[in-house]
Design a protein with these regions (language model features):
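Short runs within selected transmembrane alpha-helices of multi-pass transporters and secretion channels
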Residues: 50-68, 76-84, 105-118, 200-204
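Structural signal for membrane-spanning alpha-helices in multi-pass inner-membrane proteins
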Residues: 22, 65, 91, 95, ...
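Alpha-helical transmembrane segments of multi-pass membrane proteins
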Residues: 37-60, 187-193, 259-262
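Membrane-interface helix-loop junctions in multi-pass transport and translocation proteins
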Residues: 84-118, 248-250, 254
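Small-residue-rich hydrophobic transmembrane alpha-helices
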Residues: 1-20, 57-76, 184-248
Length: 262
């Protein structure tokens, strides 16, 4: 529970810092990331609203893990489902009905994440949870949150590297290929996410199973769980990539009707 409380405090502090830094420097950063004169206004409108809701986003991303590790996989899944469904409902209302455009898309995302954050905090402070979020455990202690940061470094480096590569690609494409090239890259990235997100779900879902059996000193079950995950990921990735290679235009058409981009 001390780890839970310390991680919550770190997330709150990080969200405050990120909100201030990125809100103030949003236009400059977007330029650095490759936004052109045409896309800068839209990107800035979306970013400023999304940044203001970074607290809710970080709570959902960071605290939902504590629900999964306790064995409440369904509750954890409902967090994602609730956010996704609300976002799907609000997007067309804000974008088209209210005519808010990009700002509406950002607001819909923030509101859906806020509902997910409330859902998580209500569960972690409720009676069903095994580990309860308490104010007394929110005082930062290096010996408590230090190991958490150490364990997260590898994931941080991996995701940061992916982000830097994405920024580099976008900036280069914007400079040498224009908005059409950036749009094409965005479509490719979206298609790749269709592949990677289920893989992340499989791997994250297997983490508690492997952890429980490792702690119970059952190496055979750990190996079986890993082998099952590995084979599932290989089969899914191979099948999906084969379909995309055979029908590339069909997948591109999901995200745009522009023939030039397709």
């Amino acid at each position: 529970e001390k780890i839970l409380g310390n991680c919550f405090t770190l997330l709150v502090g990080l969200s405050i810092i990120l909100t201030i830094v990125f809100y103030v420097s949003a236009p400059t950063l977007l330029r650095l990331f490759g936004a052109s004169d045409v896309t800068l206004t839209y990107a800035s409108d979306y970013a400023r609203i999304y940044i203001l809701g970074s607290f809710f986003v970080l709570i959902v991303l960071g605290m939902n893990t504590f629900i999964t590790t306790q064995g409440f996989a369904r509750i954890s899944m409902m967090t994602t489902v609730i956010g996704a469904v609300i976002n799907i409902i609000l997007d067309p209302i804000f974008i088209f009905v209210l005519g808010m455009g990009v700002k509406g898309a950002a607001l819909a995302t923030v509101l859906s994440q806020s509902v997910g954050a409330v859902w998580i905090l209500r569960f972690l402070t409720g009676k069903k949870t095994i580990l309860r979020l308490k104010r007394s455990n929110m005082h930062l202690e290096l010996k408590v949150f230090g190991p958490c940061l150490a364990l997260g470094i590898s994931t941080f480096v991996m995701l940061s590297t992916e982000s830097l590569l994405s920024i580099s690609f976008t900036s280069s494409l914007s400079r040498f290929g224009g908005d059409v090239a950036v749009g094409a890259m965005t479509i490719i990235t979206s298609i790749s996410q269709l592949v990677s997100l289920p893989l992340q779900g499989i791997c994250q879902g297997g983490q508690p199973i492997i952890s429980y059996n490792f702690g119970a000193n059952k190496p055979n079950r750990v190996k079986k769980a890993f082998f099952t995950q590995f084979c599932t990921c290989i089969i899914y990735t191979s099948a999906f990539c084969l379909v995309v290679m055979i029908f590339p235009k069909a997948f591109a058409a999901i995200f745009t009707s522009d023939k030039e981009l397709v």
